[in-house]
Amino acid sequence: MRIILLGPPGAGKGTQAKLISEKFSIPHISTGDIFRANIKEKTPLGIEAKRYIDNGQLVPDEVTIGIVKDRLTKDDCDNGFLLDGFPRTVAQAEALDEFLKGINKELDVALLIKVPEEFILERMTGRRVCTSCGASYHIRFNPPKIEGKCDICDNELIQRKDDTEATVKERLEVYSKQTYPLINYYKDNGIISEVNGTESINEVFGNISNILGRDK
């Protein structure tokens, strides 16, 4: 089974990807992980990607596509894969389809985890992390016993820069601009399936499992 996972930042894609990977015995392929692995191994594509990242630039499509293609040729992808973080644009989606067609394969489903913006804002801006031990909390869903203090080591809890309202809104705007055309692309291809990401982890995964069971 070959799956694309779509959804806004904070939609719980990482959690669901892990569950899908385990249940269906397919590798969870995150573009971030691929970049880090290639940079660490100093592959030609990794060296090129690092050059852009070090200069604060977006890695061009041709480099990203090259790294993803290389990963998809590994033996563990023979029976399928779950792609997370790629494609991000229609151009990348078209390149992926062309590559798969060249090896007589195609995507089975593009899974979209739908979560309203206000829900994402509450989920992400409410996150707090301990400055000492790294324990995670949420001011509403998983609050510490004493406000602003870690239950484990009693050190200060902070909000990460990535979780400020301004940063979250900016990330959502980028996601919206990039991903809506991508959603329409997969709708036109007839392979998109949507799940409600505001439900519990188990409920979301149950719905995903039902969809993937139908598409097997």
Swiss-Prot record:
Residues 30-59 are annotated as: NMP. It is found in: Cytoplasm. It catalyses: AMP + ATP = 2 ADP. Residues 126-163 are annotated as: LID. It comes from the Bacteria. This is Adenylate kinase. Consists of three domains, a large central CORE domain and two small peripheral domains, NMPbind and LID, which undergo movements during catalysis. The LID domain closes over the site of phosphoryl transfer upon ATP binding. Assembling and dissambling the active center during each catalytic cycle provides an effective means to prevent ATP hydrolysis. Some bacteria have evolved a zinc-coordinating structure that stabilizes the LID domain. GO terms for molecular function: adenylate kinase activity; ATP binding; zinc ion binding. Monomer. Signal peptide: none annotated. GO terms for cellular component: cytoplasm. Pathway: Purine metabolism; AMP biosynthesis via salvage pathway; AMP from ADP: step 1/1. It is an enzyme of class 2 (transferase). Pfam families: ADK, ADK_lid. Its EC number is 2.7.4.3. Catalyzes the reversible transfer of the terminal phosphate group between ATP and AMP. Plays an important role in cellular energy homeostasis and in adenine nucleotide metabolism. NCBIfam families: adk, PRK00279.1-1, PRK00279.1-2, PRK00279.1-3, PRK14527.1. Belongs to the adenylate kinase family. AMP binds at residues 31, 36, 57-59, 85-88, 92, 160, 171. ATP binds at residues 10-15, 127, 136-137, 199. Keywords: ATP-binding, Cytoplasm, Kinase, Metal-binding, Nucleotide biosynthesis, Nucleotide-binding, Transferase, Zinc. Zn(2+) binds at residues 130, 133, 150, 153. GO terms for biological process: AMP salvage.
